[in-house]
UniProtKB/Swiss-Prot annotation:
<feature type="topological domain" description="Cytoplasmic">
    <location>
        <begin position="562"/>
        <end position="628"/>
    </location>
</feature>
<feature type="repeat" description="LRR 5">
    <location>
        <begin position="181"/>
        <end position="202"/>
    </location>
</feature>
<dbReference type="GO" id="GO:0009986">
    <property type="term" value="C:cell surface"/>
</dbReference>
<feature type="repeat" description="LRR 4">
    <location>
        <begin position="157"/>
        <end position="178"/>
    </location>
</feature>
<dbReference type="InterPro" id="IPR000483">
    <property type="entry name" value="Cys-rich_flank_reg_C"/>
</dbReference>
<dbReference type="InterPro" id="IPR003599">
    <property type="entry name" value="Ig_sub"/>
</dbReference>
<dbReference type="InterPro" id="IPR032675">
    <property type="entry name" value="LRR_dom_sf"/>
</dbReference>
<dbReference type="InterPro" id="IPR007110">
    <property type="entry name" value="Ig-like_dom"/>
</dbReference>
<dbReference type="GO" id="GO:0045211">
    <property type="term" value="C:postsynaptic membrane"/>
</dbReference>
<dbReference type="InterPro" id="IPR003598">
    <property type="entry name" value="Ig_sub2"/>
</dbReference>
<dbReference type="GO" id="GO:0030424">
    <property type="term" value="C:axon"/>
</dbReference>
<dbReference type="InterPro" id="IPR036116">
    <property type="entry name" value="FN3_sf"/>
</dbReference>
<keyword id="KW-0966">Cell projection</keyword>
<keyword id="KW-1015">Disulfide bond</keyword>
<dbReference type="Pfam" id="PF00041">
    <property type="entry name" value="fn3"/>
</dbReference>
<feature type="region of interest" description="Disordered">
    <location>
        <begin position="587"/>
        <end position="628"/>
    </location>
</feature>
<feature type="transmembrane region" description="Helical">
    <location>
        <begin position="541"/>
        <end position="561"/>
    </location>
</feature>
Amino acid sequence: MAVLPLLLCLLPLAPASSPSQPATPSPCPRRCRCQTQSLPLSVLCPGAGLLFVPPSLDRRAAELRLADNFIAAVRRRDLANMTGLLHLSLSRNTIRHVAAGAFADLRALRALHLDGNRLTSLGEGQLRGLVNLRHLILSNNQLAALAAGALDDCAETLEDLDLSYNNLEQLPWEALGRLGNVNTLGLDHNLLASVPAGAFSRLHKLARLDMTSNRLTTIPPDPLFSRLPLLARPRGSPASALVLAFGGNPLHCNCELVWLRRLAREDDLEACASPPALGGRYFWAVGEEEFVCEPPVVTHRSPPLAVPAGRPAALRCRAVGDPEPRVRWVSPQGRLVGNSSRARAFPNGTLELLVTEPGDGGIFTCIAANAAGEATAAVELTVGPPPPPQLANSTSCDPPRDGDPDALTPPSAASASAAAKAADTGPPTDRGVQVTEHGATAALVQWPDQRPIPGIRMYQIQYNSSADDILVYRMIPADSHSFLLSDLASGRTYDLCVLAVYEDGATGLTATRPVGCARFSTEPALRPCGAPHAPFLGGTMIIALGGVIVASVLVFIFVLLMRYKVHGGQPPGKAKAPAPVSSVCLQTNGSLGPTPAPPAPEPAAPRAHTVVQLDCEPWRPSHEPTGP
């Protein structure tokens, strides 16, 4: 019976501990407003001066707004266990770092706003777990890199992706191509210089694509653009229309953009940046016939090259055209040469063979191609045995040449034959363009009058040397048919082309027509065997004169030291004077007569100790009187 009262006392406590009752809501963070009375729960902390995500968040919240604060990082534990969160706003903070897996528990999240922060990169693990994300806003950050797998978890659900106002030079285009449900893609105000062909071909639901203010010079045709009509303004456009914005890019208006010019547009502000004839003109006002390309022209290629087996070899090929041609190489066996363990192909047209073998010899073909055509050139490579060793101390000099070494003189027979051989394998040379005289640093170019071409405004000379890729231009008046090229480098091969710039009577536009090309070589700088140059003599004379002066000073110092020692350590002219004598003690035998001469010395004998008495008196000279 004693148990019954105890049970009656415990009955009021039972409902409080029942699992069916809802848990006590967490306290609302300081400076925040919380909506917990009705579903969905929300925590609103905009502009609250927060330095980090509040730890006392209600984990049941469906909406969390932390915009306009000073949050610098999102840690793994900040948003843990918030499985019901649908909307998260972290806009306009100072976020620099997002921990890997920071959003891993937000599997129900649909909208994530990270715009207006300081993110510099987005890795593969930072957005992990967002399997239901539809809106991702990353604009106004400092993003310079986007990992290829950063959007893998939300690739099938993402509908809105905003990457505008960042520092992106490259994008994972393959990953973007997997966003099959994306409706809006914002790539404007970045540093994108190119878009690969077919990058948007699988974005079937794309309705708006913004690529405004990038560095795009061309936009490749895409199947998506050909299927849907293009309208510049979304207002009044049909449901299936694609809104494409690409203004503010330095468009190069050539034949590669004809497909875009043919599409129907309402209005936009795109303009051409190049070529110079179309620069600054409204894109949609340029006629289709003005979108032209120029076929490639090979301006430089390596002369016949001979290397010993086992040594590296570099084959060079340069070409110009509009658009810039792409250079490829074909081996003597007819195979396309690419990057491998023995060869490297560079975008500038250089093919480097790291280690040559006897089987590498033959004719290599350089193929330069662009949208307007292609051009080829052959380069001969000979692989032979190593050359005989040369003496390291051997010296040689070239015989002097009459006159100035840089004067224009006809080439020698050897150089003429070498130039003729190079011309046979070089680019086609027009007989109308001739380099009649060339020395070590100058060459005279001549071409005939181009009467068949009406309305010539000027001539243009293009040339470059075998040692660099810089193409030099010279504009010549229309009434001139020769030009002296100066400031050339000695011992180099130059490829030169002359073009006529004229006004096309049919279209009224400026056009160019090649007059011809030529190849020539400047003579090497000679080392004369005569007397050394004046600067050399002047330096030698200065050194010799300085040596003479130094030697004279040393001799003078030596003489002074010797004289100083001879005079007993006193300067010359100041010899030591004899000390004054006050008295002299003389030994006498009782008389003051003249002192007899001393006897001859006798052999020394032992002396006994004797006492000698001295009579001393003041000394007087003999010529003075002794009395008054």
